[in-house]
UniProtKB/Swiss-Prot annotation:
GO terms for molecular function: small ribosomal subunit rRNA binding; structural constituent of ribosome. InterPro entries: Ribosomal_bS20, Ribosomal_bS20_sf. Signal peptide: none annotated. Residues 1-23 are annotated as: Disordered. GO terms for biological process: translation. This is Small ribosomal subunit protein bS20.
Amino acid sequence: MANTKSAKKRIRSDARKHLRNQSYRSRVKTMIKKAELALANGVVDEAALRMAYSTLDKAAVKGIIHKNNAARRKSRLAQKAKKVALAAQAGSAA
């Protein structure tokens, strides 16, 4: 247990930061799931992708996730979107 006043304050501030970070991580996961759900249905939802990219970038800037983690997730989303777009294009051409 913390003995000093500053250690007790640090525990309180860490708890607040933990809640904030947890909330933002949840938001990131939700946005990615929305984008992936649209892609799974064969639709490239530009708005959902943009929101997912934006949320990932903001999380990286705030230090909630590492910038390489954000880049990797964005890249994987883009790959999936490209695959769906090509499949839709091939389907409409055939």
